[in-house]
Design a protein with these regions (language model features):
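NAD(P)+-binding Rossmann beta1-loop-alpha1 motif at the extreme N-terminus of oxidoreductases
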Residues: 2-81, 111, 143, 178
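NAD(P)-dependent dehydrogenase/reductase Rossmann-like domain
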Residues: 3-11, 15, 288-304
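Beta-strand segments within the central parallel beta-sheet cores of soluble alpha/beta enzyme folds
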Residues: 23, 216-226, 277-281
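Hydrophobic residues within alpha-helices
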Residues: 31-35, 121, 168, 209
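Rossmann-fold NAD(P) dinucleotide-binding segment
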Residues: 68-134
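Rossmann-fold dinucleotide-binding core
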Residues: 93, 112-194
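Active-site-proximal catalytic alpha-helix in oxidoreductases
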Residues: 148-156, 177, 181-213, 222-236, ...
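Interdomain hinge/lid region at the active-site interface
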Residues: 182, 230-295
Length: 304
């Protein structure tokens, strides 16, 4: 079923490429918004919580789907940004959505997922039969990057089909790096998350030491932020960590999910990532204490 919200002009009625963006969470909401600003595209959105879709269509130029099961529209591309493997499987593989995508179209998944899911989608009979190009395209840059359209995209998929998806990805990114074939985007995101987790652990321990030593932490930041210790985490989280402000950003529970994916992959490769295992235990402690929705920088609370 399709519920059309009247666009601000009648341009949606023209014959233009049609794209569906599924998943209007913290990241997906503004990403779909940036995509809708392209006057040469028809953008449709879907979210399991319908009131979020209602909010989106009131703010941006587009229409919403009430259901994926009985959609009569034929899409040129589908973009997903969802929570986990189960959510993505439900939307892409088990909703009937593949009946609503054109032959030779594309699917771009911005979620962080397992390699097994990438393989399952890429090799699904309907994907192969309709010659659909699937790209695993996890992102980095957080909520701020999504809002400002400045995400970094790690892309895995068929290089020959890149031109198809660039019109979408360029709407909300500052960089698009094609890493390699299917799965390489997710592998790169695993590397990214392991690095970030270690940075946050180190930053937490450094701030804890400085604070317990009664240092002027603003002066400490001034002294070290221009040197080798500088990082995005330091620039954007140092001051909020000092204040104990964690009610924003990338949630602890999502980092737990991402670290589990990375550590599962490392196990398959006979790698013992002891530091990452220890950090995962710390994040699990936070989650069990009720802090699973706080920003990952809340790791410092365990050192209080």
């Amino acid at each position: 079923m399709l519920l059309m919200y009247p666009p601000r002009n009648r341009s949606l009625q023209k014959s233009k490429p049609k794209y569906l963006f599924a998943g209007l969470g913290t990241m997906g909401f503004p990403m779909a918004g940036h995509l809708s600003k392209n006057p040469n595209l028809d953008v449709y959105v879907f979210n399991r919580t319908s009131k979020i879709s209602d909010k989106w269509v009131k703010k941006y130029h587009g229409a919403k789907l009430l259901s994926l099961n009985s959609c009569s529209i034929k899409f040129d591309g589908i973009i997903t940004c969802l929570k986990d493997d189960a959510s993505i499987s439900s939307v892409i593989l088990n909703s009937g959505l593949l009946k609503s995508i054109k032959t030779n179209a594309f699917i771009v998944d911005h979620s962080t997922t397992s390699l097994d899911l990438v393989s399952t989608i890429s090799n699904h009979p309907d994907i192969l039969d309709k010659k659909i190009s699937f790209f695993d395209a996890p992102v980095s840059g957080g909520e701020v990057g999504a809002i400002n359209g400045l995400l970094s995209i790690m892309l895995g998929g068929p290089k020959a089909k890149l031109s198809k998806v660039k019109i979408v990805l360029e709407a909300y990114s500052k960089s698009i790096t094609h890493i390699g074939p299917s799965g390489h985007g997710q592998l790169t995101k695993m590397v990214n998350q392991l690095c970030i987790a270690s940075l946050i652990q180190g930053l937490s321990e450094g701030i804890a030491l400085g604070s317990k030593s009664n240092l002027n932490m603003n002066k400490v930041l001034e002294a070290i932020s221009g040197g080798a210790a500088q990082s995005w985490q330091m620039d954007n989280r140092f001051k909020t960590m000092i204040k104990g402000d964690f009610d924003f950003g990338f949630a602890v529970d999502l980092m737990i999910k991402d670290l589990k994916i990375a550590l599962n992959q490392s196990k398959k490769l006979d790698l013992n990532l002891s530091t990452s295992k220890s950090i995962l235990k710390n994040y699990n402690k936070l989650s069990l204490s009720g802090d699973g929705n706080l920003d990952t920088s809340s790791l410092i609370k365990l050192l209080g």
